[in-house]
């Protein structure tokens, strides 16, 4: 569950390290974001000399959450951190690599590019 003011790690090589969620995009008054949801975030920490700078407003898709996610089979999956991948307006990732595992729910939400870049899909 990602809400406003939540800090997330960045799971790609776009240049940002930490994000803070400003808004969860969705229908109506979306308070919490789950895996596969798009958020508006501000970059709180960035690597020097990279295209994405600190205090820049970006779009990102949530790829890992500490809150357990229930699947239709009854199994639940939980990750060690909250993480997101920065995307452009078309929904494609800005980075060329994705670090760490991502959830299978991303494939259902048509983020196949992120799933193909990830080293492991759980």
Swiss-Prot record:
Q: Does the keyword Ribosomal protein apply?
A: yes
Q: CDD domains recorded for this chain? A: Ribosomal_uL14 (cd00337)
Mention any one GO cellular component term assigned to this protein in its UniProt record.
cytosolic large ribosomal subunit
Signal peptide, first to last residue:
none
Per its database record, what is this protein's job?
Binds to 23S rRNA. Forms part of two intersubunit bridges in the 70S ribosome.
Q: Which NCBIfam families match?
A: rplN_bact
Protein's name in the database: Large ribosomal subunit protein uL14
Q: Which organism is it from?
A: Rippkaea orientalis (strain PCC 8801 / RF-1)
Query: Which lineage ranks, top first, belong to the organism behind this chain?
Result: Bacteria, Bacillati, Cyanobacteriota, Cyanophyceae, Oscillatoriophycideae
């Amino acid at each position: 569950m990602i809400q406003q003011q939540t800090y997330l790690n960045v799971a790609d090589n776009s240049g940002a390290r930490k994000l803070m969620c400003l808004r969860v995009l969705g229908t109506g008054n979306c308070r919490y974001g789950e895996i596969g949801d798009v958020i508006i975030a501000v970059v709180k920490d960035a690597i020097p000399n990279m295209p994405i700078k600190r205090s820049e407003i970006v779009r990102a898709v949530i790829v890992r959450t500490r809150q357990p996610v229930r699947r239709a089979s009854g199994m639940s999956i939980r990750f060690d951190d909250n993480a997101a991948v920065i995307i452009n307006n078309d929904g494609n990732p800005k980075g060329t690599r994705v670090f760490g595992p991502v959830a299978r729910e991303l494939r259902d939400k048509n983020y196949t590019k992120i799933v193909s870049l990830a080293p492991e899909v759980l």
